[in-house]
Amino acid sequence: MSETIQLAQKLIQTESVTPNDNGCQTLIADYLKPLGFDIEPMPFGEVENLWARAGKDGPVIVFAGHTDVVPTGPEEKWTHPPFSAHIDADGIMYGRGTADMKSSIACFMVATKQFIKQYPDFKGSIAFLITSDEEGPAVNGTVKVIEALEARNEKFEYCLVGEPSSSNTLGDSIKNGRRGSLSGHLTIKGIQGHIAYPQLAENPIHTLSPALSDMVNKVWDKGNDYFPPTSFQVSNIHSGTGATNVIPGDCVVDFNFRFSTEQTPESLKAGIHQILDSHQLNYDLDWNLSGLPFITPADGELIQAVSKAIEQEMGTTPELSTGGGTSDGRFIAQTGAQVIELGPLNDTIHKIDERVSVSDLEKLTQIYRNTLINLLVT
């Protein structure tokens, strides 16, 4: 069994449901230290973070990843135990974190070892930024490490995030940007009363409905060359006492924007307030911005190096995509670094029987290794 697969199994067999790292980062640090990495644990609150760097000069390429995983769900529904990292007869490894994203960490660790052994005098630096707070609130993880690095003026040019980016075959897609995410928590205030006496009450569901229709039907933008149109989606609506003869006193709505670079948080907020005010609603509205949109240009050195590495190993040309959810790349992109995401297939992430192909992990290791060569040698 190869070193990549052995490392991946060790990480996956370590139960680390967010925000618990449970020793994964110690395993990573122990592997990297003999390769010449300076190891720096960066804990914030209950979250474990690791910054490890080999080299003093630029350019600096950072591999960013997370050791925390989402809960397994009912373990009895799994074909193999979720923390077993079992490999079946078809070469498929099962386990929580196989795709998202402990296997990617193992691949980059081995790729780095192979690269340093082959090119001990490489130009630039290689670093690892690993957190146990990506699947949770993401407030004491990557964002705090970035703040600490910026405070001491430690900069880097490139960042490869090992999130599962592939759709149908390994390396068919590179995420070179992400949409922003803005959430709203809206409370429409009415007047509670008996359902038989509507003239003595004000039903907030009724008063909200026309405004909500305007929000849903509004074309916020048409997108651009890099992003699809901005999306507005309602996730929750809560109202009523549970009784069938009471007009509710309020209605609470949770909604979310996934927005392109055609919008700003301020423009989206203004649009919502304009709609609510035009319907003369009595409301409270709280906002939460969890990420700004970012884009890494297709002609940048990082995308060129990664695309070439995929072509070298897979014989295919990847497409560039900004679809999907947010990742910690949103925090890293604010530094000005070129950021992309490249990892295994994403079709089983967060699901029962999350799994990856062992052969894909061997190929991904070589893609990562070739990326280092393309950036730091050629």
From Swiss-Prot:
<dbReference type="InterPro" id="IPR005941">
    <property type="entry name" value="DapE_proteobac"/>
</dbReference>
<keyword id="KW-0457">Lysine biosynthesis</keyword>
<dbReference type="GO" id="GO:0009089">
    <property type="term" value="P:lysine biosynthetic process via diaminopimelate"/>
</dbReference>
<dbReference type="Pfam" id="PF07687">
    <property type="entry name" value="M20_dimer"/>
</dbReference>
<keyword id="KW-0028">Amino-acid biosynthesis</keyword>
<feature type="binding site">
    <location>
        <position position="135"/>
    </location>
    <ligand>
        <name>Zn(2+) 2</name>
    </ligand>
</feature>
<comment type="function">
    <text>Catalyzes the hydrolysis of N-succinyl-L,L-diaminopimelic acid (SDAP), forming succinate and LL-2,6-diaminopimelate (DAP), an intermediate involved in the bacterial biosynthesis of lysine and meso-diaminopimelic acid, an essential component of bacterial cell walls.</text>
</comment>
<dbReference type="Pfam" id="PF01546">
    <property type="entry name" value="Peptidase_M20"/>
</dbReference>
<keyword id="KW-0220">Diaminopimelate biosynthesis</keyword>
<feature type="binding site">
    <location>
        <position position="66"/>
    </location>
    <ligand>
        <name>Zn(2+) 1</name>
    </ligand>
</feature>
<protein>
    <recommendedName>
        <fullName>Succinyl-diaminopimelate desuccinylase</fullName>
        <ecNumber>3.5.1.18</ecNumber>
    </recommendedName>
</protein>
<dbReference type="InterPro" id="IPR011650">
    <property type="entry name" value="Peptidase_M20_dimer"/>
</dbReference>
<keyword id="KW-0170">Cobalt</keyword>
<keyword id="KW-0378">Hydrolase</keyword>
<dbReference type="GO" id="GO:0008270">
    <property type="term" value="F:zinc ion binding"/>
</dbReference>
<feature type="binding site">
    <location>
        <position position="163"/>
    </location>
    <ligand>
        <name>Zn(2+) 1</name>
    </ligand>
</feature>
<dbReference type="GO" id="GO:0009014">
    <property type="term" value="F:succinyl-diaminopimelate desuccinylase activity"/>
</dbReference>
<dbReference type="GO" id="GO:0050897">
    <property type="term" value="F:cobalt ion binding"/>
</dbReference>
<dbReference type="InterPro" id="IPR001261">
    <property type="entry name" value="ArgE/DapE_CS"/>
</dbReference>
<feature type="binding site">
    <location>
        <position position="100"/>
    </location>
    <ligand>
        <name>Zn(2+) 1</name>
    </ligand>
</feature>
<comment type="pathway">
    <text>Amino-acid biosynthesis; L-lysine biosynthesis via DAP pathway; LL-2,6-diaminopimelate from (S)-tetrahydrodipicolinate (succinylase route): step 3/3.</text>
</comment>
<feature type="active site" description="Proton acceptor">
    <location>
        <position position="134"/>
    </location>
</feature>
<dbReference type="GO" id="GO:0019877">
    <property type="term" value="P:diaminopimelate biosynthetic process"/>
</dbReference>
<dbReference type="InterPro" id="IPR036264">
    <property type="entry name" value="Bact_exopeptidase_dim_dom"/>
</dbReference>
<feature type="binding site">
    <location>
        <position position="100"/>
    </location>
    <ligand>
        <name>Zn(2+) 2</name>
    </ligand>
</feature>
<dbReference type="GO" id="GO:0006526">
    <property type="term" value="P:L-arginine biosynthetic process"/>
</dbReference>
<comment type="subunit">
    <text>Homodimer.</text>
</comment>
<feature type="active site">
    <location>
        <position position="68"/>
    </location>
</feature>
<dbReference type="InterPro" id="IPR050072">
    <property type="entry name" value="Peptidase_M20A"/>
</dbReference>
<keyword id="KW-0862">Zinc</keyword>
<keyword id="KW-0479">Metal-binding</keyword>
<dbReference type="GO" id="GO:0008777">
    <property type="term" value="F:acetylornithine deacetylase activity"/>
</dbReference>
<dbReference type="InterPro" id="IPR002933">
    <property type="entry name" value="Peptidase_M20"/>
</dbReference>
<comment type="similarity">
    <text>Belongs to the peptidase M20A family. DapE subfamily.</text>
</comment>
<feature type="binding site">
    <location>
        <position position="350"/>
    </location>
    <ligand>
        <name>Zn(2+) 2</name>
    </ligand>
</feature>
